[in-house]
Amino acid sequence: MKIKKLAAAVISVIICGAFSQTAYCEDDAANVNVYPSEDHKNISPYIYGVNSGVDLNTVSAKSFRLGGNRMSAYNWENNMSNAGSDWKNMSDMNLISSAAEQFRRVPGGAALNASYEAQNGNVPYTLLTLQMLGYVASSKKGQVSEDMAAPSEYWKKVVNRKNGEFSSEPDKKDNYVYTDEYLNYLIEKIGKSDSETGFKAYALDNEPALWHSTHSRVQTEPLKCSELIEKSVDLASLVKETDSGAEVFGPSLFGYSAYDSLAGAPDWAELKAANNYRWFIDYYLDEMHKAESESGTRLLDVLDIHYYTEAKGECGERSCGHYDNDGCVKARLDSVRSLYDENYHEDSWITDTGAEFFPLLPNIQESIDKYYPDTKIAFTEYNFGGGDHISGAVAQADTLGIFAKYGVYFATIWSFDQNEYQLAAMNMFTNYDGAGNGFGDTLVKSECDNDNISVYSSIDGEDEGTVKIIITSHDLHNETPVNIKLSSDSRYADAEVYALYGDSTEIHRLDDISKIKDNSISIDIKPLSVTEIVIHSDKKSAVPVIAVCAAALIAVGAGVCVALKKRGK
């Protein structure tokens, strides 16, 4: 997928109150005020990302991660990996089964293929997961039983430093897999982090708090907090020694109980009491900060967590697919609020046990400010469900808006079997017109008086001449009249309107707004939808729909359904 680079722009987020569970009147209008020159805040483009397995011809992504449980036991020398509890502790060639042919029989094929995919998809930021578990799959295929646990012939020991000469062809007959040789090999093939093709960052493995469960053939007992720090410091130091410009992500916490206590790590209670930590994230940040003080090098650039909503719908199930149940759909839309809204209490086991660290983002930032200032935040896996329904698109759009508002640096959605609506929502931020135009990098001030919608506003660079506004509607059945006032010295003339709604993943181009008076717009927003309004300060001829569709095919590929149909309401 080849598209134009995302132009520098300015983005604004305003969440219009708490998303109520009650129904809304049909004439419940929303009044939105946008102040393009006020309260600017930078936004990272890398929040618009995906994990491997997503067809990059279907989404204009800005970041890409190669991760997941299999990467913990990935042997770069022969491309074998072990699935752990995900699939019968099977060792096989799964990670390169769909790789480009040229990478299936060479060392590091999974990593090289990830770089190749990202380059073909015009994705500027790539993150590679490194192995910290301790052992990786050997050359022996098949199910690994309990009596074949490491150390055994079914595994190769991972050693960070070879302390010897690197080889362009790793020795597959010894009993070790060397991480420094792996990094050197990748740099020789695709370059360092400052090159176009090199990995920009490395993750310190994947979900270590679950190793004793997901990879019980290697890690038989729950990991101690102190063990994780020791492993993390050693591997992070190696990364910085090898490629000083690369960013380090860690510790890839799988969910709430990992944030809290590293999922009940054996030494957590003692460490918490001795240091008055609130949760494991405090300890991890503090220890990595101490490691920087000792080494003179920052060893953790980005705090890496995973988040899958635990909120239950009216049916009592987590992230259900009961789209004909209004209560279940509303629960999905509301669940995003656990990231930021102190007045929201989701229906989940987390709330039942106190939900001490909700809302999540303010609590994370508090820990960063106290224990390791300037650490960035990443959600390298997340999903709010509904990938096959418009509610999933609305939840995804709100998630991206919240990531923008709270300064998240990097985010890559982990897609399930169905992801079309979620990817379409991402395209509303990165490629709404099929020609590569999207949102950018700074918040501005907005205000709204209606609980039923969320509003995200943007300008290009520092130029108030074009204002872009995304509105998400949480009303399941009725249109919402929205009155928009732009408080700016610029005089606005016309606007384009794009929308994602109903039973289609197409981004539709609706009727243009041809005349704007007194910097005010009134528009009816479709129920359960994502709408983008692109407002121009001077009269610009509308691009013919045929030309836009042709540009979409060139920019995103013929396989992408970004149908810009000019329609009425």
Predicted regions, residues:
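C-terminal beta-strand-rich structural cap/linker in extracellular carbohydrate-active enzymes
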Residues: S514-K540
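Short, hydrophobic alpha-helical membrane anchors of single-pass surface/secreted proteins
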Residues: S541-A551
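Mobile, glycine-rich extracellular loop/lid and propeptide segments
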Residues: E117-N120, L127-A137, F166-I190, G198-K231, ...
